[in-house]
Swiss-Prot record:
Residues 92-151 form the S4 RNA-binding domain. One of its GO terms (molecular function) is rRNA binding. The gene is rpsD. Pfam families: Ribosomal_S4, S4. Belongs to the universal ribosomal protein uS4 family. Gene3D superfamilies: Ribosomal Protein S4 Delta 41, Chain A, domain 1, RNA-binding S4 domain. One of the primary rRNA binding proteins, it binds directly to 16S rRNA where it nucleates assembly of the body of the 30S subunit. GO terms for cellular component: small ribosomal subunit. Residues 1-46 are annotated as: Disordered. Keywords: Ribonucleoprotein, Ribosomal protein, RNA-binding, rRNA-binding. GO terms for biological process: ribosomal small subunit biogenesis; translation. This is Small ribosomal subunit protein uS4. It comes from Cytophaga hutchinsonii (strain ATCC 33406 / DSM 1761 / CIP 103989 / NBRC 15051 / NCIMB 9469 / D465). Part of the 30S ribosomal subunit. Contacts protein S5. The interaction surface between S4 and S5 is involved in control of translational fidelity.
Length: 201
């Protein structure tokens, strides 16, 4: 499965919520896309409900199938609750944290900033979006990238978004991944237990 690059509104309408960021389309057309979207009321099987939840998580965090399965496998081998481990690992991705800090306006934009080497971790450029941050890691905008309009615009409009597991210093454009978030701190509407049940089949 290739990375989805189509309209975000179409994905939001499929799940009935702004999975890939704010979507004005949901306000006008809060039903599934397609010719029969408005009248789609078939009873869903347990499997389809579980699969849909996994797809929602993949679209939310911008992760492809193979990488998602690998992340789940790692989460299952860790101590603790598998579903919560999965979400914590998705939250600890570099691209997601760049988005959470407000450096980028969306996870898709954050991914591009990472790929194009605008982000540093502990002083070194890291261009791997899936890079797993560890508690104590410092990350921020590369010195020569601090004047990029997309970054400054995003920081000016999203700086109010604060997450307890992150720290951010606006003047230096440097942040810190303090710790892994607790489940109740993660705002995404994902029922991770359904994903665990799907992989347990």
């Amino acid at each position: 499965m290739a990375r989805y690059t189509g309209p975000r509104s179409r994905i939001s309408r499929r799940f009935g919520e702004p999975v890939m960021g704010d979507s004005k389309a949901l306000q006008k057309k809060n039903y599934a896309p397609g010719m029969h979207g408005r009248n789609k009321k078939r009873k869903q099987s347990e499997y389809s409900i579980q699969l849909k939840e996994k797809q929602k998580a993949k679209y939310t965090y911008g992760v492809l199938e193979r990488q998602f399965a690998k992340t789940f496998d790692t989460a299952a081998r860790k101590q603790g609750i598998t579903g919560e481990n999965l979400l914590k690992m998705l939250e600890a991705r570099l691209d997601n944290t760049v988005y959470r800090l407000g450096i980028a306006s969306s996870r898709r934009a954050a991914r591009q900033l990472v790929i194009h080497k605008h982000i540093v971790v502990n002083g070194d450029v890291v261009n791997i979006p899936s890079y797993q941050l560890k508690p104590g890691d410092q990350l921020g905008v590369r010195e020569k990238s601090k004047s990029i309009e997309a970054i400054t615009d995003s920081l000016s409009t999203q700086s109010a978004k604060k997450f307890t597991w992150l720290e951010w210093d606006q003047s230096s454009m440097l942040g810190k991944f303090v710790t892994y978030p607790q489940r109740e701190e993660i705002p995404e509407n994902i029922q991770e237990q359904l994903i665990v049940e799907l992989y347990s089949k």
